[in-house]
From Swiss-Prot:
Pfam families: TIM (PF00121). It comes from Ruthia magnifica subsp. Calyptogena magnifica. Pathway: Carbohydrate biosynthesis; gluconeogenesis; Carbohydrate degradation; glycolysis; D-glyceraldehyde 3-phosphate from glycerone phosphate: step 1/1. It is an enzyme of class 5 (isomerase). Its EC number is 5.3.1.1. GO terms for cellular component: cytosol. This is Triosephosphate isomerase. InterPro entries: Aldolase_TIM, TIM_sf, TrioseP_Isoase_bac/euk, Triosephosphate_isomerase, Triosephosphate_isomerase_AS. It is found in: Cytoplasm. Keywords: Cytoplasm, Gluconeogenesis, Glycolysis, Isomerase. It comes from the Bacteria. One of its GO terms (molecular function) is triose-phosphate isomerase activity. The active site is at 94 (electrophile), 166 (proton acceptor). It catalyses: D-glyceraldehyde 3-phosphate = dihydroxyacetone phosphate.
Length: 248
């Protein structure tokens, strides 16, 4: 039985004060949450959140990492730096990193490998553009993104990878894939993994990352192959986020 995982991606939001308020607000409602909950916060606030979540069931994650251990990479953050703040998770290959910063499937696969090599669990993001879906290319796009990672790290590595399917056309748009559309793609992802190893496919968590919110979370999480959510905007309000966390 796969545990529901809810991961909040704050993106480039919050302030020092807002971070404190938001984390305390989330912690105050965690007593009856059965899901695994992760908050992926801006790197500047990781030390602040590390202190707030100590000895709690709230897990800390980062939003990106550089493939290099250290060096002249201005503005970047390494796996060692992430671990220094007690984080165990890192988002890799988010659609915004792919589209705005030119991260290719190969770069994403390299980041997945670096995360794994450093005992960080990657939240490996995949997904298609609107034109891909309209031209019936969702499966080919998603399968290529997965294949490049399998070729680099092997199917066994998926024991320690969380997959996040994010239909790019449904991110930050208030347009959500129907539960059936989401389930169909999640089922396809699992079937692709099963072609390599059926047991690993069954234990791999596949999160939905397309504008899940407190209104649609329960229906989405009720789908057979949807194991949680990668939450953007709704993770910035404690009560909305908690409602999603409790929906599973």
């Amino acid at each position: 039985m796969r545990q529901i995982i809810i991961a909040g991606n704050w993106k480039m939001n919050a302030s020092k004060e807002a971070t404190n308020t938001l984390v305390i607000g989330i912690l105050s409602g965690m007593a009856d949450v059965k899901s695994k909950v992760i908050v992926c916060v801006p790197s500047l606030y990781m030390s602040q959140v590390e202190v707030l979540v100590v000895d709690s069931q709230l897990n800390l994650g980062a939003q990106n990492l550089n493939v290099n251990k250290l060096g002249a990479f201005t503005g970047e953050i390494s796996a060692d730096m992430i671990k220094d703040f007690g984080a165990k998770y890192v988002i890799v290959g988010h659609s915004e990193r792919r589209s705005l910063y030119g991260e290719t499937d190969e770069i994403v696969a390299q980041k997945v490998q670096v995360a794994l090599d450093n005992n960080l669990t990657p939240l490996f993001c995949i997904g298609e553009l609107l034109e891909d879906r309209e031209s019936n290319n969702t499966k080919s796009v998603v399968s290529k993104q997965i294949q490049v990672v399998i070729d680099r790290v092997g199917i066994e590595a998926f024991k320690n990878i969380i997959v996040a399917y994010e239909p790019v056309w449904a991110i930050g748009t208030n347009v959500t894939a129907t539960p059936q559309q989401a389930q169909d793609t999640h089922a396809f992802i699992r079937s692709m993994l099963a072609e390599y190893d059926a047991d690993i496919a069954q234990i791999t968590s596949i999160l939905y990352g397309g504008s899940m919110n407190s209104r649609n979370a329960a229906e989405l999480l009720n789908c057979k192959d949807i194991d949680g959510g990668l939450i953007g905007g709704a993770s910035l309000k404690a009560q909305d986020f908690l409602q999603i966390c409790k929906a599973g």
